[in-house]
């Protein structure tokens, strides 16, 4: 008879969890950041708030964002005027949009990842889906499984309403699933649409206005598994370790609340300071076992919550400017897409590394770090090992 120990050993993979494919998607509606303040104040019937508009223009100018993608068009907003007010009951209208569009955008990203992976979708064993855009039952995971035609036996996990750090969380969970289930192939999808957070401006709540200047829509998907099939699957990055921690004395720094008016967003000014002050502790805990203490020897994927966070992290750690190039590139071209950002940055990095002939998927370097930051304040730290290109 087989012992429990033998049975458990047979269930586990031998090698580390590996990212085997990445796909991304955005809505077709592209918004130019330089003209967005005029559009935003016009569509929200707020053009009389001239001083506030000037403040918003300065926010957009400082955002380091050139363009964003948004499902919400002028037509949709004109049909739903309550979404354009600052605090008008509008959750039903918002929910009607996101329960359809979040899985749909996720499907586009997933199809690209599956195509790159090159294996039949029937080989997908697990699905991990996350979004901060709306809540529904059965969830987006169920809707996506139906849209893609995944097997009914696919083991699903749905994460709602976690915020910007969760791009790191889903990698941590997928790592555990891949390494503890021999032969598992995990489809991970992050899909975000700002229809839940869009609202008009308010003089008394400038933190809400910060969100209007930063957030964009996007979905990203990866396929993850251990022990890639040689000659069939192409590894991109290996996941070596993953950790989550709460930043001390940071309660209330970032809050979101689902209300009749949609998802409200609250931000303390000190978020960049709190993150930069505590980031080295996470790095030390992650890289001391590997004997690494030079943060410039790593390739970097950091959730781009906003330019101030990136600037302060760079300053605090003495990072060379090029370290956050891929991160800043994604912020510039897409804005803050919450959970999807770090996967967009991974995609940007591996493509640029190949195009520039840098030798590895991680800008020619062997080891890297992926950071997720969000409500809590919660920090996700993922240690990555690159693959030769």
Curated annotation (Swiss-Prot):
GO molecular function terms attached to this record: acyltransferase activity, transferring groups other than amino-acyl groups; naringenin-chalcone synthase activity
Pfam families: Chal_sti_synt_C (PF02797), Chal_sti_synt_N (PF00195)
Keyword Iron on entry: no
Active site residues according to the UniProt entry: 164
InterPro entries cross-referenced by the UniProt entry: Chalcone/stilbene_synt_C, Chalcone/stilbene_synt_N, Chalcone/stilbene_synthase_AS, Polyketide_synthase_type-III, Thiolase-like
Recorded family membership: Belongs to the thiolase-like superfamily. Chalcone/stilbene synthases family.
Function comment: The primary product of this enzyme is 4,2',4',6'-tetrahydroxychalcone (also termed naringenin-chalcone or chalcone) which can under specific conditions spontaneously isomerize into naringenin.
Protein name: Chalcone synthase 1A
């Amino acid at each position: 008879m087989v012992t429990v120990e033998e049975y458990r050993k047979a269930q586990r993979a031998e090698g580390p969890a590996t990212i085997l494919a990445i796909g991304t998607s955005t809505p077709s509606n592209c918004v130019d950041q330089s003209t967005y303040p005029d559009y935003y104040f016009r569509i929200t019937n707020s053009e009389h708030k001239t001083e506030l508009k000037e403040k918003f223009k300065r926010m957009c100018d400082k955002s380091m964002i050139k363009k964003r993608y948004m499902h919400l068009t002028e037509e949709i907003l004109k049909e739903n005027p309550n979404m354009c007010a600052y605090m008008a009951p509008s959750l039903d209208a918002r929910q009607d949009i996101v329960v359809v569009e979040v899985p749909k955008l996720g499907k586009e990203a997933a199809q690209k990842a599956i195509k790159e992976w090159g294996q039949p979708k029937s080989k997908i064993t697990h699905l991990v889906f996350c979004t901060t855009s709306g809540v529904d039952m059965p969830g987006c995971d169920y809707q996506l499984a139906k849209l893609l035609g995944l097997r009914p036996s696919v083991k699903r996990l749905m994460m709602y309403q976690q915020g910007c750090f969760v791009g790191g969380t889903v990698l941590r969970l997928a790592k555990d699933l891949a390494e503890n289930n021999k032969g598992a192939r995990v489809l991970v999808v992050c899909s975000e649409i700002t229809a839940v957070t869009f609202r008009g401006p308010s003089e008394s709540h400038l933190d809400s206005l910060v969100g209007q200047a930063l957030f964009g829509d996007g979905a990203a998907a990866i396929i993850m598994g251990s022990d890639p099939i040689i000659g069939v699957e192409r590894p991109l990055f290996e996941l070596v370790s993953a950790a989550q921690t709460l930043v001390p004395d940071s309660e209330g720094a970032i809050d979101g609340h689902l209300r009749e008016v949609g998802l409200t967003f609250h931000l303390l000014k000190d978020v960049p300071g709190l993150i930069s002050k505590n980031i080295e502790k996470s790095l030390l805990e992650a890289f001391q076992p590997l004997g690494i203490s030079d943060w410039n020897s790593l390739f970097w994927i950091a959730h781009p919550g906003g330019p101030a966070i990136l600037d302060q992290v760079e300053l605090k750690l003495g990072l060379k400017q090029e370290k956050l190039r891929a991160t800043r590139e994604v912020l510039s071209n897409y804005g803050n897409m919450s959970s999807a950002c770090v996967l967009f940055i991974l995609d940007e990095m591996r493509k640029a590394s190949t195009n520039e002939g840098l030798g590895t998927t991680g800008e020619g370097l062997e080891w890297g770090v992926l950071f997720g930051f969000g409500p809590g304040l919660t920090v996700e730290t993922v240690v990555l090992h690159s693959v030769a290109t």
